[in-house]
A protein has these predicted regions:
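Divalent metal-coordination and catalytic microenvironments
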Residues: 80, 137, 210, 238, ...
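Membrane-interface helix/helix-cap signal primarily in integral membrane proteins
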Residues: 57-229, 233, 549-556, 562, ...
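Non-globular, low-confidence helical/coil segments that flank catalytic cores
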Residues: 123-124, 129-136, 179, 415-655
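Membrane-interfacial loop-to-transmembrane alpha-helix junctions, especially the N-terminal start
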Residues: 2-9, 47-48, 305-309, 354-358, ...
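Alpha-helical transmembrane segments of multi-pass integral membrane proteins
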Residues: 341-448
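N-terminal leader/targeting segments
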Residues: 1-71, 470-475, 591
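Hydrophobic alpha-helical transmembrane segments
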Residues: 1-5, 177-186, 205-217, 276-283, ...
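Hydrophobic alpha-helical transmembrane segments in multi-pass membrane proteins
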Residues: 24, 34-52, 222-385, 454-499
Length: 655
């Protein structure tokens, strides 16, 4: 293991923490750790020189990203170049990533346009991949998230090199310039559309997810099951499915008695082509380049270990785009791969037998990675430790060969073969999906940790760094793995503990939501105002976004999986349906509801203790006092609420 690689990586991680940390005390601590690590590990002047050059280069790249020359303000005229595979159509709106060509500069932007006719919709849905438009529009910043648990669009788009949104007001189609890349992209899109047009099945969903890295046309329910159980994190997001694909291809080529050198060349060519198929997404690029670098090291005797290859790619990624370190897929892919290297090394040197090694790797990897995964996905199901190992075995032996054969059969129109694969694999995957859906119901098996503080970040990454040092010195023994697993769990447990009381106001559209978190572990009270129903010009009811979807992530991000009380004010029957969805995601002690005076329908049964509040005062199980104030005689029959939380009074006015 090349020490300078991983010390440089650690220095960059510390530098990013210093940049984003608001506390001067913590900034000072990180600076001292960085200086101490630097002095301790580097004795050679030549090493010091090159590491200084790397750090200076990364610093300059960071300055270019965070102090950029952005798209000019105001109304602009230019040329937009789009790839239809990057577009997403939601109702009348189409959004996607595009290249904006102005008179004096080019920019990557977030394209947005509201379609006005079916002809325009058909234009964006054509089979040809590339689309060139002469446009007039306005540049504006990407919308900031309203709540901590909302999707952080500015951070995500900055991490992939996009700093502005371009809202198109009008356009005119231009002729595309022919090129070999556009020909390849057109073939890719035809391939993609052929699979996407097949009847809905689990095999089709897996083909879209793994072969193309696309989730927009996949079954949302299936994806949600996998997210909650951790299957998607370990496979698609980390890029480990590509590693499984490489292992399978190696076995096939060796069985055909093809030499190792020829096999490597064939695999590298195939991986480069596949890289263009997935548009060189972050996790796929990491998996492909790690294989290429590892094989190059063997060929040219560079003596690079797998962990060295991972560190070099980390540094090269920062040279390419420094802001990539903000990307969730980047952090998960590199973090999970580093942890997988540690657990694989432990299994290889301390265990005998393939099955025993597989079980231990499947068990240790998610435990050590628990804080990392929960930081981004908020929850982790205990059964996923076993399910992840099962899915990996199934992917390597059955699913990946089956999915590849299915895709080939669809393209060359072998209908009977594709139907046969769908019949057999769908039976298997349908059974797995029922198991996953059944496992989701057990809330006591679900871990919820929320997002961590900067201190938890630094402790976790130092722990990983120490583990890598142990890897280098060959002292990664069974006791070490136990220590790292316990340390990882302790860091995870420290994340959701609240040292102080908090009252958090959540912005959920037209609704008012208040989350009260007392001092301690996993306790909270949620106050939600019911949605007011509106009618359109024809008298049809209009419902806005479900509050359960808007609120759930904002509770999970705080590390809360148990609610002492849920208060729903001014509720209608539609709100009770949202309430039932919310209760499925949390362990709830009590629900107290005040119905809208105009609501005469029955709410039905809920799975928890439910009480209905009339005019007057009530004390909840959490100690919060709630007073329902009579309607003030206005045209709308609504009732305002007064909440008293630890001496603070909050008035929610129903206007």
């Amino acid at each position: 293991m090349k020490r300078w690689i991983w010390v440089t990586v650690l220095e960059i991680i510390l530098g990013s923490l210093i940049l984003f940390e608001s506390s001067f005390l913590l900034k000072g601590i990180y600076v001292l750790i960085g200086i101490w690590t630097f002095v301790l590990h580097f004795r050679s002047k030549e090493q010091l020189f090159w590491v200084f050059m790397i750090l200076i280069f990364v610093g300059l790249r960071s300055y270019q990203v965070y102090h950029p020359t952005v798209v000019p303000e105001g109304e602009l005229v230019g040329i937009i170049r789009l790839n239809r595979d990057d577009l997403k159509i939601n109702g009348d709106f189409v959004t996607g990533i595009a290249e904006l060509e102005l008179t004096s500069s080019n920019h990557q932007v977030l394209f947005q346009y509201k379609m006005h006719s079916e002809k325009e919709r058909a234009l964006f849905e054509e089979e040809e991949a590339d689309l060139t438009l002469s446009v007039i529009g306005k540049s504006k910043p990407v919308n900031e998230p309203k709540n901590r648990g909302d999707f952080n669009a500015p951070s995500y788009y900055r991490s992939i090199g996009i700093l502005r949104m371009f809202e198109v007001k009008g356009f005119k189609r231009l002729v595309n310039k022919p090129s070999w890349m556009s020909l390849f992209q057109n073939l890719r899109r035809i391939f993609y559309l052929k699979i996407n047009k097949q009847p809905e099945s689990f095999v089709r969903t897996y083909a879209l997810l793994l072969l193309f890295g696309k989730t927009k046309d996949a079954d949302a329910t299936v994806i949600q099951h996998y997210k909650r159980l951790g299957i998607m994190h370990v496979l698609a997001i980390s890029g480990l499915h590509i590693t499984l694909f490489i292992h399978m291809l190696e076995k096939v080529l060796w069985k055909w008695k093809i030499t190792r050198e020829t096999s490597v060349a064939v695999i590298i060519i195939g991986l480069v082509i596949y890289g263009y198929f997935i548009h060189w997404n972050i996790s796929g690029t990491r998996a492909i380049l790690m294989y290429v670098l590892a094989q190059s090291s063997k060929k040219f005797h560079w003596k690079l270990s797998t962990s060295d290859c991972l560190g070099i790619l980390f540094l090269l990624s920062l040279f390419y785009r420094t802001s990539i370190i903000e990307n969730v897929a980047f952090q998960l892919s590199y973090g999970l791969t580093a942890i997988l290297l540690l657990t694989s090394y432990f299994a290889e040197h301390n265990l005998q037998g393939k099955w025993k090694k597989t079980i231990w790797i499947a068990f240790l990897t998610p435990i050590i990675a628990l804080p990392l995964i929960c930081h981004y996905f908020f929850t982790w199901n205990l059964l996923s430790v076993l399910l992840a190992g099962l899915v990996v075995l199934l992917f390597e032996s059955i699913l990946i060969p089956g999915i590849l054969l299915y895709a080939l059969a669809v393209v060359i129109k072998w209908v009977w073969i594709s139907n046969g694969i769908v019949f057999f694999l769908d039976a298997l995957l349908n059974g797995l999906n029922h198991i996953f859906a059944f496992c989701e119901q057990f809330l006591f098996l679900r871990f919820t940790f929320g997002t961590w503080s900067t201190i938890a970040w630094i402790l976790y990454w130092i722990m990983i760094y120490v583990a890598l040092v142990c890897y280098e010195k060959s002292c990664f023994r069974p006791y070490s793995s136990v220590v790292f697993s316990i340390a990882s769990c302790l860091i995870a447990l420290s994340i959701p503990y609240h040292l102080h009381e908090q009252i958090i106001f959540l912005s959920t559209g037209s609704q008012v939501s208040v989350l009260y978190i007392p001092k301690g572990f996993n306790q909270a009270t949620l106050i939600v105002r019911g949605e007011i129903s509106f009618a359109d010009s024809k008298g049809n009811g209009i419902r806005k976004q479900s509050f359960s979807k808007a609120i759930t992530n904002n509770i999970l991000v705080e590390g809360i999986s148990q609610l002492d009380s849920i208060v729903l004010t001014n509720a209608s029957l539609e709100d009770s349906d949202d309430l039932k969805e919310l209760i499925q995601d949390f362990s709830v002690s009590e629900v107290v509801v005040s119905k809208n005076p105009s609501e005469k329908r029955d709410f039905g049964e809920l799975d928890v203790l439910t009480q209905y509040q009339e005019i007057g005062e009530r004390q909840l199980l959490s100690g919060v006092k709630w007073e329902l104030i009579p309607a003030n005689g206005s045209k709308k029959e609504v009732q305002s609420s007064m909440f008293t939380i630890q001496g603070e009074r909050i008035l929610i006015v129903e206007d």
